[in-house]
Structures are given as C-alpha cells and as structure tokens.
Amino acid sequence: QEGDAAKGEKEFNKCKACHMVQAPDGTDIVKGGKTGPNLYGVVGRKIASEEGFKYGDGILEVAEKNPDLVWTEADLIEYVTDPKPWLVEKTGDSAAKTKMTFKLGKNQADVVAFLAQNSPDAGAEAAPAEDAAD
C-alpha cells in the first residue's frame, strides 16, 4: 500500500506531541516533543539506534535479538498501528512492553511515506526502481 507523503505530513500532527523530525544540521522539519525519538531518517535506520535517546526495554530487546534489523516502511506501518503485537512478534516475548502507548488507527501508510521522504537512507526500500525499463 503506497502512502501519500503530503497527507502524511498533516497526519503527523498526531505524532508531534512526542516526536520531532529534525535534520542532522538542526533544521526542524516538524517541531515536536522529545518523549519519543527524533524520526528524521527513521526509514532505513537500525532499530532503537537514535543517538542519545533512552529507549524502553521492549524495543531494546528487538534490537538485541535482531541486530541487523532496520526500520522498513512495512514494519513502521505495523508498529504505529499497534506497537505491542509488533514487539511480541519480533522478540518472541509475550510480556514485551512498549513505551509507545499511542496507536495510529488510520492513514499509517501516509505517515510512513512522509517519514520515508525525510529518511536519506530509505534507499531502494522507499523508492520504486524506475530505471528498470531503460
């Protein structure tokens, strides 16, 4: 399911109470809270790897058990829909807990498309290859 980044930027208003999107040079793409990690570059980034952010045990366990796992658009869509089942699936631990209690009930693909647009490492995962027909 392809998302609409422009719609996702508007929908991100629900996320900015806890998250910002700030470029490495300090430019605020979306000013937001610091309860959650900065989401600039999240697509293609290793799980729970935002420098200086204090992650919860559940997401740290995902990173520990899956050291090469990076956020894909598909995983982010699943995660923002309901973080707990995603954590349980990735850790194999039914008691896994999340610090992110918010659940995004609709327009997840749009929000993730917006995040991918602000993720330089999203690479091929985020953009369909258009050169194949040449």
Curated annotation (Swiss-Prot):
Source species of the chain: Paracoccus pantotrophus (Thiosphaera pantotropha)
Keyword terms of this UniProt record: Electron transport, Heme, Iron, Metal-binding, Pyrrolidone carboxylic acid, Transport
Keyword Heme: yes
Protein name (record): Cytochrome c-550
Modified residues (Pyrrolidone carboxylic acid): Q1
Protein role: Electron donor for nitrous-oxide reductase.
Residues engaged in binding heme c: C15, C18, H19, M100
Lineage: Bacteria, Pseudomonadati, Pseudomonadota, Alphaproteobacteria, Rhodobacterales
GO molecular function: electron transfer activity; heme binding; metal ion binding
Post-translational modification: Binds 1 heme c group covalently per subunit.
